[in-house]
Amino acid sequence: MRVVFDTNVLYSALAAKGFCEEVVDEAVAECDIVWSNALKQELESLITRRHKIGPATRVALEAYADLCEFVEPEPLDKRVCRDKDDDVVLATALAGNADVIVTGDEDLLVLKKFRGIEILSPRQFLERLDRTG
C-alpha cells in the first residue's frame, strides 16, 4: 500500500509520543511512504514556528525522509480544497500513485476519496492496516 501522510499527522508523530507516532511507525514497517519536498518544507516550517528544531527532531525527520519515496507533484488543474496547502497533499498523492492519504484535517477527510485515493483519519488507517496486515 502506498501512503501519503499529511503534515498534521507527521507533526503529531514527531512532537508527541502517542497514537500518531504508532500509526507512522506501523506504516513505515508495512507500506511504501510517498512524500514531496513541498510537504517536507511545510513540516519543517511548522516545527520551526512551534518549537525550535532540536538535534533529536532533526535526526527523526531525516530518518523519516530516508524511508520515503520523494515525488514532484504537479499543481492540480483546479483548486479542490479551501486551503491551498491541502491541494499539495492531494497532488503529492497523485504524483506518487498513492492508495491512501492519512490526515487529521477535516477539509480533506470530508472528501473521503480523491481520484480513487482514499482519505482516512489515522485511526481509520490503522484499522485498515490491522485488517489487511
Name what the model sees in each region.
Residues 1-35:
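Short, well-structured N-terminal submotif of metal-dependent ribonuclease cores
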Residues 6-7, 35-36, 104-105, 121-122:
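A secondary-structure boundary/capping signal
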Residues 18, 34, 55, 80-87, ...:
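Residues at secondary-structure transition points
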Residues 30-33, 97-99, 117:
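Short active-site oxyanion
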Residues 67-101, 106:
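Active-site neighborhoods of divalent-metal-dependent phosphate/nucleic-acid chemistry enzymes
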Residues 80, 96, 106-133:
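Acidic, PIN/NYN-like endoribonuclease modules and their adjacent C-terminal/linker elements
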